[in-house]
Amino acid sequence: RRYVGALAYHLYDTKETELAHDLAHMRNLAAEYGIPIWMTEFSVPNDMTFSGAMEWMKIIHKLVATYDVSAVDYMWGFFGAWERNHTILSIEFLDGKYVQHHVGPLYYLTGQFSKFVRPGQVRVETHSSSQDLLVTAYKSGAQSVIVAINAGQEDRRVNVTVTDAVAPLHFSAIRTTVREFWSELEPIASDTSTFNVALPAQSVTTYRGGSIDSAGTLSGVGIKKSAQ
């Protein structure tokens, strides 16, 4: 055990039912020995399109929320101009010198997680009222991060309740849709533990914040710890 830092796997060449069984087995094995799980390589078809990149968002959510995965890697972070598919970032060089780079929906949607859910944060328990609303939440010290995916085809307005939070609350929000990338939304201020938000169809929105104490500084939010 002392020589094993993590359990790692890919998601290739497996039927859906077999994959679910295998991932559950790895989750249970990791829990038994207190070892983190890393999913170290995978890609999705049509990942240069927004709809394809949204499929990747669903995979990230399932790995983290259902199978307790601590690190999720895409197949290729970046390559040169000779490979534009299955890359989060494509960089062009000429005679060893930088020319330009290209990013697409995959870059921005992945960033809704990677820019804000940082190493050391702990995933906390969440519940959703709809199978199209995929929500995970994370906590580190005074900061809470909520990632909300509307995987459906209809815009939604929903209430977000931070259990056991001490009002007032303050959250910033950033969103990616087919028309906007990392768009900063109006900050959210609430005098209760519940606030109402709009989640456009096929979007990912990340909220950062927590309780505001009498001095106007961010204090801890009491949410039940679930998994790392």
Place the predicted regions along the sequence by residue:
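Loop/turn elements at helix/coil->beta-strand transitions in domains of secreted/extracellular proteins
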Residues: 2-5, 32-37, 67-72, 118-119, ...
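Conserved, mostly hydrophobic/aromatic
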Residues: 7, 63, 110, 146, ...
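Solvent-exposed beta-hairpin/edge-strand motifs
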Residues: 163-182
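C-terminal beta-strand-rich structural cap/linker in extracellular carbohydrate-active enzymes
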Residues: 187-219
